[in-house]
Amino acid sequence: VIEHRKERKGDSFRNLRIYQDMEKRNEEFLPRDLYYYGRELVSHRLYEKGRQVLQAFLRDREGWKENKIDAARQLAVCCYGLGQEEEALLALLQSFVYDMPRGEICCDLGRHFLDRGRYREAVFWYEQALGLKPERDSGAFIQEECYDFLPAISLGGCYDRLGECDKAEPYNRLAGSFRPDSPCYLQNLEYFKKLWRP
């Protein structure tokens, strides 16, 4: 048996350098180039430059709607990384300009409110995510867990923090139906067992 393996890891900066070289040469960026350059900047935590590039992409009238929606998410990551929480929230909401809400965006909005102790608002967004179906034919980057496990486990956590364990526990069970081996689900399962013990 012959195996072909790479001797070393790939160059994670390769694509970023390509776009940076294009910029140095003053080459014209097509909307698609701006989008992918922005994603590369975000993945390398270059948030200020990423914010600028993604905003330029979102201002451009051209560009595929799925890329616009994801660019709004990536812009939010930049804003969070720069400590601009309100701008991050606005970036997520901007995605609604392009199409119906996606599970990924709803989960991001849920997380925004969860992290700030605003559990009722978080519940709203996680419930929206749980009620959506992924647009598999769209060609978009889909995070399957944003349509089942993530909103379910998060709803369990939100309701627990609200003191509504009668709602929290069923959502944890639902999360377990999606990922029965999840350490988070299993830990919560033990927590609820202890809670309900007489």
Predicted regions and their residues:
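Short coil turns that delineate tetratricopeptide repeat
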Residues: E27-E28, E62, E66, M100, ...
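Catalytic-site signature of metal-activated, phosphate-bearing donor transferases
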Residues: V1-Q52
